[in-house]
Amino acid sequence: MLEDFKRTLSNMFSWIFTVHSTGLRFSSVALFVAVICLLLNWRAAGVIFLIVAFFCAFFFRVPKINVQFNEDEIASPADGTVLSIKTENDPNSVVIRIFMSVFNVHVQRAPVDGKVGEIFYHKGQFLFADKPEAASQNERNLMQFFHKADPNRFAHVEQITGAVARRIECWVKPGQEIKQGNLIGLIRFGSQVAVYLPKNSVRVVVKEGQKVQGGNTVLALWK
């Protein structure tokens, strides 16, 4: 029966966006409980679970993108607001940090065509994702991406949890070939994504405070 609810939800939202399978699981359970509550005439509870079902579908939405990037363009891996653009621990890299509120799309996409390098997972705390200390203290997962045409060009993506986001999903493996815009992972319920680029090889075209969209916005250009 839950599979029927999953198909129903998927069809309901398909004209606006698709819903990732993770979200369909949450939404279908909430919708199932809502129907039971309404059948038992527990209207308030039924309405609450209907809202939960919609919220889960909305949160795990995967918007359809159809952007063709030029060879010199680096795509944003995430939706959100640019928190900072600066050199941090590595003097040869520039780091673009993107804050994702609970209302942003929370899937991440590959910033370049290329190959996945190493993947580094670090356990940590669950501080608010927009705080500076979250970058070094929170649970995080770093995925290395190397450009298909030049392995010296990289665009590493780091998923960072927040106070509400407490689950990182990584959907790629070391050595995997990847296309720009392909889905690479997800962070649940509000978080931060950092993009590491070679400082002397790129020109950043976004600004702090700017809204960006994963797979749609150009973050930087290769020189």
Task: Show the residue positions of the predicted features.
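Contiguous, well-folded functional domains in the mature portion of proteins
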Residues: 1-223
